[in-house]
Amino acid sequence: MKRVLLFLATNLAVMLVLSIVLSVLSSFFGISTRGSGGLLLMAAVFGFGGSIISLLMSKWMAKRSYGVQVIEQPRSEIEYWLFNTVQRQAQQTGIGMPEVGIYDSPDMNAFATGANRNKALVAVSSGLLYNMSRDEAEAVLAHEISHVANGDMVTLTLIQGVVNTFVIYISRVLAGIVSNFMRSDDEESSATGGIAYFAISMVFELIFGILASTIVMWFSRQREFRADAGSAKLVGKDKMIAALERLARGHDSQLDGSMMAFGINGKTAMTELFMSHPPLEKRIQALREMR
C-alpha cells in the first residue's frame, strides 16, 4: 500500500496546485473555463497532468520519504542475496533490472514503484529482511516484481487521470452553481464572486478527490490479487501463502495505524472500501484456490 498511498498523496497535492494555477490563469489572462467544452478539456489536461507528474516523481518521492538506501554494490551476504534474487526474478519476467533498496523500519514491508517497467525501484524494509525466512522474502519480492511486470503503476496513473478529470470537472460545475446561487449583485463584486467560486471549487475537489479514491483503491485491490498470482507462478504458491501467513501473525505488533497501512501488508481502521490491499485472509484464500 505504500506506493499507492504515496502516489495518491502526491497526486492530490499536485492536482490542487494545478487547479490553483488554472484559476490564476483564468483570472489574469481571461481564459474562460466555465463553458462545458473548455472546462472538460482543461480538466483533462490538469487531471492527467497531476497523475503523470506523480508517476514521474514516484521513485524520487519514495527514496526521499522513506530513506531508501539503494544498493549500488552489495556489501553483505544479505545484500548479495537480495540483489541476486531481484535480478533473477526480473530476468524471469522480462523486465529491466530495477534499482534495489533497503529502508530502516521494523515493519515487514516492501514496495515497487517507478514510471517505467524497465527502470523501477524495488525496496524492502529491514524488518522484512531480518524477520522473514528466505522463502517468504523471496515470495514478497516476486510479488513486487509482478507489480512492475504488470505495469500496475502506469495503469494506476491512467485510472487516476480519468478520476482527476471528472473530479475537477464536476467540482467546477458545482462550484459555479453554488457561487451563482450565493451571489448578490448588489452586495458582491465580480472579484469577490471569483474568490468564492475558487474557494468552493477547492473544497469540492478535496471532498470528491477523497471519495473518488475508492475507485482507485478498488483497482489496487484487484492488482494485488494479480500480483499474488504472479508471485505464485514465479516461486510457487506455497511460498506466497507462507509469506502472507507470516504477515498475518506479525502485523498486529508492528507500527501504529498510519504506518501499518503501508507495504504489502497493513492493518487499517478504515473499511475495506478505502483499503488498497484486500484482507490477508482473502488473499490467502485466493491463492489456495489457484489451479
From Swiss-Prot:
Domain of life: Bacteria
Binding locations of Zn(2+): 143, 147, 224
GO molecular function, one term: metalloendopeptidase activity
Cofactor details (free text): Binds 1 zinc ion per subunit.
Topology class, membrane: Multi-pass membrane protein
Active site residues per record: 144
Pfam families: Peptidase_M48
Transmembrane segments: 4-24, 37-57, 158-178, 198-218
Enzyme class name: hydrolase
Localisation per UniProt entry: Cell inner membrane
Keyword Lipid metabolism (UniProt): no
Cofactor(s) recorded in Swiss-Prot or TrEMBL: Zn(2+)
Gene Ontology cellular component annotations, sorted alphabetically: plasma membrane
Keywords tagged on the record: Cell inner membrane, Cell membrane, Hydrolase, Membrane, Metal-binding, Metalloprotease, Protease, Transmembrane, Transmembrane helix, Zinc
Enzyme Commission number(s): 3.4.24.-
Family affiliation: Belongs to the peptidase M48B family.
HAMAP family hit by this protein: Pept_M48_protease_HtpX
Protein name stated in the entry: Protease HtpX
Organism: Tolumonas auensis (strain DSM 9187 / NBRC 110442 / TA 4)
Gene transcribed to yield this protein: htpX
